[in-house]
From Swiss-Prot:
Lineage: Eukaryota, Viridiplantae, Streptophyta, Embryophyta, Tracheophyta
Residue positions binding Ca(2+) 3: 298
Family designation: Belongs to the annexin (TC 1.A.31.1) family.
Binding positions (Ca(2+) 2): 253, 257
Sites where the protein binds Ca(2+) 1: 25, 27, 67
Keywords: Acetylation, Annexin, Calcium, Calcium/phospholipid-binding, Metal-binding, Phosphoprotein, Repeat
Protein name: Annexin D8
Induction pattern: Up-regulated by dehydration and salt stresses.
Modified residues (N-acetylalanine): 2
């Protein structure tokens, strides 16, 4: 369930004009911008961006970048982007880090529908003039390269049909490779990159039924490396997305210095989907609400915007 609260009736032209007015004069009226964009759903934001372009012959995101700064600017621009553009940007930023953040790629590959993943790849090529697969291949080697390239490039079945016999046989394949009985990880990569989320969940359940332990616990017995870290993230993301995201949020807030990139990514990408469930589990596991944690660890306009996406603040 979504956390964002948006009005049923609104005027994209009026919103565009109010945003322009907020950006004029001696100082930017950040509160006005938050009260508009922090309370508009995806469809409404698209119309506002179109209206802004038609009226002022300027991209709204360019305007926001020129007027705002810091974590607030990064979060609100991420929010205004269409989802395929957003995923392309997140993937590119993750790959450009000194140590690439492979878990961002895993999240995108695991949590998007085949159509959404294809749209993100198209947006990536449009924005950066080369493919996501090419950039992944140039920044990775070995098993981590094979896993990530396969996951982002696959167009998987997205239905609910499950083959229980296949789940049992492929649970055995994963078990053999995880325990080191196989020569390489090709079969694990094949299973993760070609099976639907429903089929993978069935495989993971059969794994635990047959071998008495979860696949993620067995993976913890191996020395940590990039490939196994990404593999664990993929499995956790597929098995229980709510738990996965609640943990990402906890880690982003509990680190020495808040990890704003992770905080932005989860709140912005899940606010219109399942953030209510994520915040509920966050509270159960941490004995503090996500709202309270954000209010404590962030400040100013950035804090106000994140809280708006969580359903707080006044609408304009």
């Amino acid at each position: 369930m979504a956390t964002i609260v948006s009005p049923p009736h609104f005027s994209p032209v009026e919103d565009a004009e109010n945003i322009k007015a907020a950006c004029q004069g001696w100082g930017t009226n950040e509160n006005a911008i938050i009260s508009i964009l922090g309370h508009r759903n995806l469809f409404q934001r698209k119309l506002i961006r179109q209206a802004y372009q038609e009226i002022y012959h300027e991209d709204l995101i360019h305007q926001l970048k020129s007027e705002l700064s810091g974590n607030f600017e990064r979060a609100i621009c991420l929010w205004v982007l269409d989802p395929p553009e957003r995923d392309a940007l997140l993937a590119n930023l993750a790959l450009q880090k000194p140590i690439p953040d492979y878990k961002v790629l895993v999240e995108i590959a695991c949590m998007r529908s085949p159509e959404d993943m294809l749209a993100a790849r198209r947006a990536y090529r449009c924005l950066y003039k080369h493919s996501l697969e090419e950039d992944l291949a140039s920044r990775t080697i070995g098993d981590i390269r094979r896993l990530l390239v396969a996951m982002v490039s696959a167009y998987k079945y997205d239905g609910e049909e499950i083959d229980e016999m296949l789940a049992q046989s492929e649970a055995a394949i994963l078990h053999d490779e995880i325990l080191g009985k196989a020569v390489d990880h090709e079969e694990t990569i094949r299973v993760l990159s070609t099976r639907s989320s429903m089929q993978l969940s069935a495989i993971f359940n059969r794994y635990k039924d047959i071998y008495g332990t979860s696949i993620t616990k067995d993976l913890l017995n191996h020395p940590t490396n990039e490939y196994l870290s990404a593999l664990r993230a993929a499995i956790r993301c597929i098995k229980n997305p709510t738990r996965y995201y609640a943990k990402v949020l906890r880690n982003s807030i509990n680190t020495v210095g808040t990890d704003e990139d992770a905080l932005n990514r989860v709140i912005v990408t899940r606010a219109e989907k399942d953030l209510t469930n994520i915040t509920g589990l966050y509270f159960k596991r941490n004995n503090v609400s996500l709202d309270q944690a954000i209010a404590k660890e962030t400040s100013g306009d950035y804090k106000a915007f994140l809280l708006a996406l969580l359903g707080h603040g006044k609408q304009l």
